[in-house]
Amino acid sequence: MNYQQQLANSAAIRAEIQRFESVHPNIYSIYELLERVEEPVLQNQIREHVIAIEDAFVNSQEWTLSRSVPELKVGIVGNLASGKSALVHRYLTGTYVQEESPEGGRFKKEIVVDGQSYLLLIRDEGGPPEAQFAMWVDAVIFVFSLEDEISFQTVYHYYSRMANYRNTSEIPLVLVGTQDAISSTNPRVIDDVRARKLSNDLKRCTYYETCATYGLNVERVFQDVAQKIVATRKKQQLSIGPCKSLPNSPSHSSVCSAQVSAVHISQTSNGGGSLSDYSSSVPSTPSTSQKELRIDVPPTANTPTPVRKQSKRRSNLFTSRKGSDPDKEKKGLESRADSIGSGRAIPIKQGMLLKRSGKSLNKEWKKKYVTLCDNGVLTYHPSLHDYMQNVHGKEIDLLRTTVKVPGKRPPRATSACAPISSPKTNGLAKDMSSLHISPNSGNVTSASGSQMASGISLVSFNSRPDGMHQRSYSVSSADQWSDATVIANSAISSDTGLGDSVCSSPSISSSTSPKLDPPPSPHANRKKHRRKKSTSNFKADGLSGTAEEQEENLEFIIVSLTGQTWHFEATTYEERDAWVQAIESQILASLQSCESSKNKSRLTSQSEAMALQSIRNMRGNSHCVDCDTQNPNWASLNLGALMCIECSGIHRNLGTHLSRVRSLDLDDWPMELIKVMSSIGNELANSVWEEGSQGRTKPSLDSTREEKERWIRAKYEQKLFLAPLPCTEFSLGQQLLRATAEEDLRTVILLLAHGSRDEVNETCGEGDGRTALHLACRKGNVVLAQLLIWYGVDVMARDAHGNTALAYARQASSQECIDVLLQYGCPDERFVLMATPNLSRKSNSRNNSSGRAPSVI
């Protein structure tokens, strides 16, 4: 075992010890809090539940299950629209539940293969597969919905992520297309040919179509994957030989038993009425009482025998707290946690690099053991031993840094980076239907010899003569998928010629460019004691003549916002590119995970991800509103539309009076903004702004920026394609009042696009005085209220009785409208709302021959 593997194992062990030992202090804290519950009956009921949880934890499978009981570990991945949660629930309970679980779940069930019982561990992953997941599974089920294109494309992304962490030829794969969501209004979009092509691309894995509503092929999927795992193990045993045969039971994974997060109440089985044979929160053990599971061990010097107080029954595996000092015990726990290396982030990349000293006069280069962790921190230590002991180390927070390679100009940022947190949309910017995976030696090629904009190559591992495996990598961050780049030892590649931008960080870049890279800077001319060749052939102006000289520059620099620099050097340029790419990905991930300091009412991360996903699910939002680029990640708030990053830059130049641009990934999203975006969408927006564009060619992904800018300015600034007004009999302001009262969103958008500030502020009449904002707030419609404010309605306006729109929002009990009005400076005056006459809701346009304005409520 090499030292990196040993280090990773050691870190994983320490993390598991920390997790395990963190449980009983929390349980003790619950017992102490229970003493504050004054009602005895409630106190005892809660205590019994805590005791049951405690006993279930201490009697988990790693402590009780015999080693003769084998385990099968199955991972299930797919985005929120894939239907994977319904698939698992149907298999476990025999019933159908439509809701998808964003956080996934952990489940256990007995399964019989070839007459032998196995403990089936099912891990429903809430997001893309990570390294821990990839190393844990025995097999993976990829799930997509037959009516959802994005969930289909997500499988390519998740497969490539798996290939980054593990050789996919080692584990069985199964592809599942779910039919649950198909209906007359929601037709199938993934035909059988495309689905089977995907199964061939995924190393010719088995493909099933399932329906959780009535159980089609559900049992068959899990039975097949279990049989594949058993067959793979037998094959491995035969290949190893009798002297090194594998044990009957694989090592028990503490991760599975420890991270049981989802609790599902078992329902009646198919025809028996008894409890189902699975449990998602405790291991499947024989039906034995808790007392029978306990073994009284005589006290010894090494094994303390704690005694529970009657009023505070606690697990006999935990030490007694009777008479102990809570502060001392807490300190003891902390010190013990420190001794096992608690709190250390697990590195995602590590190795020896040269670092240039920033203090010494000669700026000498010294060896450092460098680690990059998934928390966005890069650390370096004088040696591996110092890292293991966690001494003499220094950290670099990558959040406010960028990484540079001397002598190379940063390429144009590539487009189609998608949100991390949104499980359904993964930012797949290209059509991946042309993907091909070659069966020989894990290499991957596209459909043709040349790079294609629509082709993406996936790979698992590249074999090397020394028996080691070289892992592939891409420019995508933890939950993102961007246009991959062609790197010497990369396995994920696509054409970068169409790339325009990146979601959040300009430092994310491709490694190739259609143009020659500029020569290295004079910094590369310094002699390094570890350099194999000298790069001294620079011209007087610091320019180099050949590309080979540029590649000999093995240095990369991390630069902070404060101007501080850290110089590192690798041994090969492949290693340098790998470090640069990994650091760029962590910079992007850090930017996307940082919380805004604005004091806004934000949703939880999970609910916000679901809310943003609802925006992406709006009709037309899978493509840019102006150029049809796939998976746009930028929004125009007042237009209610999504766009690509290049078009968003053009929209910014229009001014906020025409387009208010915001990033889906990087900016705050209060509820009122989410409601606006999830109420309009690109299809509705273009039905207003592009209705008159017949015969005109709309820009595409391949169009130049100038072509896109001409289209956007003609569309929004000159309003050349805007739909005509629906009615000319009444003034625009009166039509706006009517449309607001009827909550006709499309008409309101159209009238606001045509209207001026004066027309938007027109009132119902002298005896009424209400503006469209008053009417929107009376309805409690925060979407219309927000749109009216953006288009210039006066939030200070009062009706004939002196009431502002805030009074109407309070009457409607619409906290969202109240918050928006206060945010824009509406006076917080709590007057008693004076009634205004309720006029007929029906339009008088047909019978109104005198030209009176249409009445509103």
Swiss-Prot record:
It comes from the Eukaryota. GO terms for molecular function: GTP binding; GTPase activator activity; GTPase activity; zinc ion binding. The keyword Metal-binding applies. The modification Phosphothreonine is found at T836. A zinc finger (C4-type) spans 624-647. One of its GO terms (biological process) is protein transport. SMART domains: ANK (SM00248), ArfGap (SM00105), PH (SM00233), RAB (SM00175), RAS (SM00173), RHO (SM00174). Homodimer. Interacts with several subunits of the AP-3 protein complex: AP3M1, AP3S1 and AP3S2. Interacts with GUCY1A3 and GUCY1B3. This is Arf-GAP with GTPase, ANK repeat and PH domain-containing protein 1.
